[in-house]
Amino acid sequence: AAKVMLDAADRRGKILDDVARLAAAHGLVPVHDEGLLHEVAGLVEWPVVLLGRIDDAFMTLPPEVLTTTMRHHQKYFSLKDKSGKLAPVFAVVSNMETKDKGAAIVAGNERVLRARLSDARFFWDQDRKRSLAGRVDALKARLFHAKLGSDYDRVQRLRALASELSRYIPNADPVAAERAAELCKADLTTGM
């Protein structure tokens, strides 16, 4: 028999409480994410919170890569240890109670996360092969605006502007300002 919790506020409360309770049982705390909480509460009718594990091999990725992959692609809640370090555990919200207490659901979500994080690792490793400075010329191939030119053209305008503006800021370094402007759009050429 299907179960439904009609009130979205009740679903949010249950998700919040259950994530916190399960995290605390492992000495962890959830990463506060009101937007994700609202989104997930709108996706499920009967929230059942389960915990899954992140393979240790992926814990060397930057925390931002892990949390972005979990949050945006999978709708998982990140957990941290008491020191604030990202834990190799995530919370997933299922839409049903199962006879195996969610074991198959957790296993499936861990498998999907492994695939997502493998992709993320590939792009991260590829991106690290070239410095941001080595990517600036690739901005020439990216159109910023038909009337304003490429992203490279845009960066050149930003460099000139940064240098000029730095003159009006006490102790500002115009060379550093130009360098920051030169690199500020280079990430647009990365896989991440």
Model feature map: region roles:
Residues 1-192:
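Amphipathic alpha-helical "coupling" segments that flank catalytic cores
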